């Protein structure tokens, strides 16, 4: 089962939380802002459901976060030293956002993008 819930607005775009629940009761909550995992809820040995991620409660918390909590990162993962690299003889200068370095895609990396979501519910296990 997939549940879609309004989460807030970012740059005039609607942001949603998507809750995917499987046949065993496990669920994951994702948002189209940064393709971010908000929570993963799994049963413990006694059947009690627990969130093992500990994500933020509000969209604003993700927007204003210093880190990349639960978000997809990119175009690169980790740091590009001094925000510069060469590829096939072409020099590239990247946005500096971590001391002297470029980190995880810069100022507007994948973590700040609004992702299009395609929901698939043609079996017992939902996916987006």
Question: Which residues does each predicted region cover?
Answer:
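Surface-exposed acidic/polar loop and edge beta-strand patches at domain peripheries
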Residues: 1-128
